[in-house]
From Swiss-Prot:
Stretches in topological domain Mitochondrial intermembrane: 92-578
Organismal lineage: Eukaryota, Fungi, Dikarya, Ascomycota, Saccharomycotina
Record localization: Mitochondrion inner membrane
Official protein name in the record: MICOS complex subunit MIC60
GO CC list: MICOS complex
Amino acid sequence: MIRTSVRRVVVNSNKFDVRSISNSSIRFNVPNNQRTPPPAVRPPTSPIIVTEGGPKGGSQKQKKKFSFAGFLFKTAFWASVVYGGTLFVATKNDKVMDFIMDKQPPYYEELLNVIEHGSIEDLKRQLRDTQHKISNFDFKLPSKAKIDEFTHELESRGENLIEETKRKLGTSTGAKPRQAIPEGNSAPTPAEQLQKPVETIHKTVDHLPLIQLDKGIASSVDSSIKSTIKSFNDLILSIDAGSQSGNESLMREITENVSKLSSKLNKLTSSFDEELSSKLKISQSELLSSYTKKELELTENLLHQFHHEKAQMEKKLGSRLDQEIEATKQTISQAAVNAVSMMRVEQTKNFEKLIKGKIDQERDGRLANLDKLNSRITELENFSTSLESQLVANHQKSLIQQSLTKLKSLLLGASSEQEKPRLISPYVDNLAKVSHESKDELIALALQDLQPLLSRESTQSILSTPQLLTRWEQLVPELRSASLLPPNAGLLGHLSSMLFSKLLFPVKGAKPDGKDIESVIGRVESSLARGELDVAVEEAANLKGWSRKLADDWVKEGRKKLEIEFLMKIIDAESKIL
């Protein structure tokens, strides 16, 4: 099918630009500066060859034309790329986002929403919707009446074009007016005119462009169209040559070609309509048969699925019904068993209540003093229990006191040198065993500290207060000499300290404010004489230097005795309040 449309005819002074544009077939491709022979020379009678592309002759390279549509497309494309890139950067940069919010370009909110929240699934869904709309679009071919109307309009425009060309041709061939002679110059004489050189005037004539076919469709165009194009080109050349004799024959040839083209177009349209109607009928019958076949297949599949699902649902419903019946049976049987059990329990309670009432009635009648006797027996039982607990506690206390007395006699009693030493740990273990039954926490804690102190001690290893006093008196000369030693003393210092220590006078009594060695010795001796071992040990522990080093063993023995006495006092006091 060939679709042809004539847009417009533009006449500008002596230049005719006839543009007959086809959607896919005919275009002008001859530049405006094409030069043809001058008007006085007739054009050659040889046929004009229409080339498939480029200028006439095909020897010169065609200059690429400026495309306004391409320029608009490229500008819109790059502007869209820059705009979209700016919005994408705005989602990553706060400064660009602030700039976008201040300027508020068009559709920026929708585009930002698409960039931030859009996904491939949304694009696929929109593409499917677009395809669905395109597939549902009802495209209709032009009818025969519209084609006839378009053909008639094409013929009328062709005739108008020819008449306008003839009219313009008559006005363009007129002589140019002479130039006026300036008033200031006089007319030249014949002799002067003969002496002037001969001037050659070159006249430039603008020619009409020829009609050419596109390169891709030149081979597939019908011969009638080619003959029509050739007739138009001959007319254009004759117009450029200024010959008036061949215009009538060319007009007749053009009219015949246009009539042939119109008749051929009518035949083609009628054949196209017939072929289209036949193919539509065939397609309709095939589509109806395929729809019927598909409907039968779908009906059969649906019936098969319906029967299959029905069987499965009946099977599931039957199994579920059996399970519910079995569960209901079990529930009913269990409820019956529970009801029977409850009845038995109620009957048993009622029977017990009846028996109890009878017994209480009999007791109130014959055994009225039984409650008083029971209360007195309970009081007697409580008294005997308390008495027994007191006896046990007293016995426990007596055992603890006996063990503690034996331990005190061994530790604090005076032991002779002829007496054989005995270990104290068995007595401590006996005390722990006896006091364990009392379950007193304080006694247990005291025994935990006392057992490590006396685990390796005997009756001779624990020093008494007189023994500690004797050892202190033996230690006094060494303390005096050590107090007189200078710092970093040598042999001479030791000898001089021993010598001068003999000259010191002993101090008797207690001197609370004295800090010299004699005052300390006097306070320790007086404290030991009064039995204040803790005060004496504290005084000895406050010594400094070599004196403290010499008295270290004595201090340890004194502290051990003090710890033993303190722990034994705690056990004795706690055992008395059991």
